[in-house]
Each structure stands twice: as C-alpha cells, then as structure tokens.
Swiss-Prot record:
Membrane topology reported for the UniProt record: Multi-pass membrane protein
Pfam family, one: Oxidored_q3
Cell inner membrane is among the record's keywords: no
Gene name in the database record: MT-ND6
Superkingdom in the source lineage: Eukaryota
Protein name: NADH-ubiquinone oxidoreductase chain 6
Principal place of residence: mitochondrion
Lineage of producing organism: Eukaryota, Metazoa, Chordata, Craniata, Vertebrata
EC number assigned by the record: 7.1.1.2
Length: 178
C-alpha cells in the first residue's frame, strides 16, 4: 500500500513541476510550487520523517508563500494568461500527463510477467529521512527530530532563517519602489 501512495505522490510531484515549468503567468507557477512543496512533504512524511516534513512545510510554504504573495501582487495582470491560451504548451502538458498516467497504470496493473519493481535498495534510508536512535527505542521520533534539527542540522536553520530575512527585505524594498 505504501508503494502505491509513494507512486501516486511522486506522479503528482512530477506533474506539478511540469505545470510549474510551463507557466504562462506567475500565479500559476506559484500554485505549481505550492502543490509540489506540499506533495514533497507528504512523501517525506510517508517515509517516517514527520518532524522534517512538518518543518519543511512550515518553512517552505509558510515563509516563501509570503514572498510569493508580495511578488505576484506586484506583477499582477488584470487578465492573466492561462495555460489554454497557448495550444502548444497545453498539448505538451496534456501529452506528458496522459503518458505518465498510462505508464503508471501499465506498471501497477500490468500483466503477470511485467511487475513494478523498485530498483533501488532502501535498507539504509534511516540515515536519509529520520534521525536513527539505534537500539534505544525509548525516545520519541519527534523529540529526536528536534534534537537532530538543532544539533546536526543547525546549518539548515541558519541558512533558512537568513534566506527568509533576505527575501523579506528585498520584497519590502521592491514594494516601496526603491
């Protein structure tokens, strides 16, 4: 069941990035980034990194959404161009979407000799997503996530905070007209 969930979330992740890259207006690009950020956090949550998924969700979608709101308000068009207005972009997007759906249906519900297999070996994913506590199972994953964020991931907190402050200062200078 988890393989199906990760496959569906990965498909939505790819489709949202295709929608972001084929944006005709800044508003639709931001929507694609919001969807891809939320789905990416869902993938991390599915692998057991609940605190990491929550932190990325709060930092990315909370902080950068403010910057996105200011910048789209400054670049707002009265009648924004939509994906339908450019037939080539729309047909390319739809063709990629249909192709990916057909491929996923073929791989997941295919014949007996064609089975969907995960090629990568995920034996050491504990080092990637969650802070591995070893044999001491008495600690909560949430508390270990906080400890890992502020001990091993202090650079992430510093870089995230600094980049958010820089973005807000730049947006404030742009909106004031300087």
């Amino acid at each position: 069941m988890m393989t199906y969930i990760v496959t569906i979330l990965s498909t939505i992740f790819v489709v949202s990035f295709v929608g972001f890259s084929s944006k005709p207006s800044p508003i639709y690009g931001g929507v694609g980034l919001i969807v891809s950020g939320g789905v990416g956090c869902g993938i991390v949550l599915n692998y057991g990194g609940s605190f990491l998924g929550l932190m990325v969700f709060l930092i990315y979608l909370g902080g950068m959404l403010v910057v996105f709101g200011y910048t789209t308000a400054m670049a707002m068009e009265e009648y924004p161009e939509v994906w339908v207005s450019n037939n080539t972009v729309l047909l390319t997007f739809l063709l990629g979407l249909v192709g990916e759906v057909v491929l996923m249906i073929y791989l997941l519900l295919g014949e007996e000799e064609v089975k969907f297999e995960v090629v990568l070996n995920f034996n050491s994913e504990g080092d990637w997503v969650i802070y591995d506590t070893g044999d001491s199972g008495m600690f909560s994953e949430e508390a270990m996530g906080v400890a890992a964020l502020y001990s091993y991931g202090y650079w992430l907190v510093i870089v995230s905070g600094w980049s958010l402050v820089t973005c807000i200062i730049v947006v404030m200078e742009i909106t004031r007209g300087n």
